[in-house]
Amino acid sequence: MIPDLEKDYLYFTRVVKRDLGLDLTLYKETQMKRRILSFIVKKKYITFGEFFKHLKKDALLLDEFISLITINVSAFFRNRNRWDVLEKQVIPRLLEDSRGKLRVWSAACSSGEEPYSLAIMMERSVGTRHYDILATDLEPAILKRAVIGEYQSRQMEELNEQERRSAFIEKGDTYQILPEYRKAIRFRRHDLLTDYYEKGFDLIVCRNVLIYFTAEGKHQAYQKFADSLRRGGVLFIGGSEQILNPADYGLATLNNFFYIKT
């Protein structure tokens, strides 16, 4: 066993939070510690302290580290039946209460499949210029991929033929989302655990991310999401997630995986 790695982890989480603004203690410790230890050994550092010194000086190493601690699993219209509920039941309800553009936030958007799915759906349900989508993620490299919006054919499996034809241009063995959809989305770096949350959203989509947070991390995120919704706004979460006491956050269950701000 390489000396000091285990006992230095607590110190490492403190200095990473203090100097880099990343709170690792709000992620599940066993999983996070295992991933970071593996990364440190791979990079041939002896202690967390040595690794941290290089982390502060090396921008590329920091980008790698951020990529390591973020979860980048995404797909177009993931769990399609839930998206059908969103389009046929939730969006019409939001439109009834809306006074202008629908404000939508795709939180932890990864490489862009989720916000582009939202844009495709909004285009046919709401129409051009009647919605605004903010898409955020912690990892700069993954956001760059999202902005480009280029995907392999295997990533397009959940899209039907009409969606492929209307929203993408084929480029050899890849597909790129059309410029009008890219322009409809504001991509920005954001840390769900530490950064400020914008207010007044009609819809917030954050799916299959908070399962990696501790109970305290989830509590903080759900409260901030609730505060960011307008009254009557909706939070859409993943199929492996559940808010056990939504009333604690001023929310009520609207449908499976959909919560409305009361």
UniProtKB/Swiss-Prot annotation:
It comes from the Bacteria. S-adenosyl-L-methionine binds at residues 72, 74, 78, 114, 137, 191-192, 207-208. One of its GO terms (biological process) is methylation. Residues 1-262 form the CheR-type methyltransferase domain. Its EC number is 2.1.1.80. Transmembrane segments: none annotated. InterPro entries: Bact_Chemotaxis_MeTrfase, CheR_C, CheR_MeTrfase, CheR_N, SAM-dependent_MTases_sf. Gene3D superfamilies: Vaccinia Virus protein VP39 (3.40.50.150). Keywords: Methyltransferase, S-adenosyl-L-methionine, Transferase. SMART domains: MeTrc. It catalyses: L-glutamyl-[protein] + S-adenosyl-L-methionine = [protein]-L-glutamate 5-O-methyl ester + S-adenosyl-L-homocysteine. One of its GO terms (molecular function) is protein-glutamate O-methyltransferase activity. Coiled coil: none annotated. Pfam families: CheR, CheR_N. Methylation of the membrane-bound methyl-accepting chemotaxis proteins (MCP) to form gamma-glutamyl methyl ester residues in MCP. This is Chemotaxis protein methyltransferase. It comes from Listeria innocua serovar 6a (strain ATCC BAA-680 / CLIP 11262).
